[in-house]
């Protein structure tokens, strides 16, 4: 009996070891890139005295996650690994997504003029402001320039032009594009569906749309935002993020027309070369992307940059999301610079393939 028990135990252990070995072999994570991305993020968090941060690097065509880095600091101690990649909050990266929806209507294009005035736009009882309102605003600019300078007013006025007084049609289009997906990812615990306040909700108000289209009135995780940006890089094909190697799963074969996608890709590259995204500019490879900052309910901030490279033939999409208490905050100077450092590291690995 004891001999039989030993054999059963040995087989069980061997089976567990085989399964563990299989999981290790099938992991999509590049261990070298994971270490380098961790070092880059930790250095930036320390430099700006941030509370926590996340970096996720995805392979454009397959959705394979090549690095998944999370760091947090408690009680002013050293930064420690954090595995909560399901955390959701408002995002400063909504402007391009709203613009893509507007482009899909065919009623606006990047060269259209939009007057943002002195940087303050009254909507019912609230004021929508651009970041430079205290310097007199941008005046009349193009839709493309509005994206490059992260103009909240340009984004909302573009939505008004595209959708008129029918915000529900905007939300219907976002749903058609699968914004906020996926709802679950193998290997990421507790990921929930993104939460949006829409005209169908009791929380809806006359100002809700203006703030939604720039990233508020919603809760979304960085990896869900990354999934949408990756679809832009992938010419409209949205694929499921994967932490374990498997066949590529397509969420949406074409989130928007190729013409709209191409227009947005030009705008995202312009945002880095000529807009507020310049800190993400790399002299090693052309990049495209968007920076953003969102203020949270506890008066802390999330600063982000999401983009892809090479811009003309995207191989990787990267999101950098940093949580920081107190000013100053800057999506471009903080998250964008981190993005650039990661791009430079990835570029070196690409040229050695």
Each model region followed by its residue ranges:
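Short, basic/aromatic recognition patches
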Residues: 38-47
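Positively charged n-region of N-terminal signal peptides that target proteins for export
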Residues: 1-4
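Short amphipathic alpha-helical signal-transduction/dimerization elements
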Residues: 233, 272, 340-347
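A short acidic/glycine-rich loop-to-helix N-cap element
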Residues: 324-334
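Short amphipathic alpha-helical face segments that pack within enzyme cores
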Residues: 92-101, 222-227, 334-341
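C-terminal motif of bacterial Sec signal peptides marking the signal peptidase cleavage site
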Residues: 14-15
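Beta-lactam-recognizing serine transpeptidase/beta-lactamase-like catalytic domain environment
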Residues: 24, 29-33, 51-88, 100-322
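Conserved small/polar residues in nucleotide/adenosyl-binding loops
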Residues: 351-353
